Amino acid sequence: MKRTYQPSKLVRKRRHGFRARMATRNGRKIIAARRNHGRQRLSA
């Protein structure tokens, strides 16, 4: 059986990257929430 996590840097960036987050309103809310929480890393 194939495992569910098949790492790919490109897919990771496209799905969870900063620009992907900024592209939608809800994504911007995620970035804002992580900024308010004081996260070192805002996105993948």
Curated annotation (Swiss-Prot):
InterPro entries: Ribosomal_bL34, Ribosomal_bL34_CS. It comes from the Bacteria. Keywords: Ribonucleoprotein, Ribosomal protein. Transmembrane segments: none annotated. The keyword Acetylation does not apply. GO terms for cellular component: ribonucleoprotein complex; ribosome. One of its GO terms (biological process) is translation. One of its GO terms (molecular function) is structural constituent of ribosome. Belongs to the bacterial ribosomal protein bL34 family. This is Large ribosomal subunit protein bL34. It comes from Xanthobacter autotrophicus (strain ATCC BAA-1158 / Py2). The gene is rpmH.
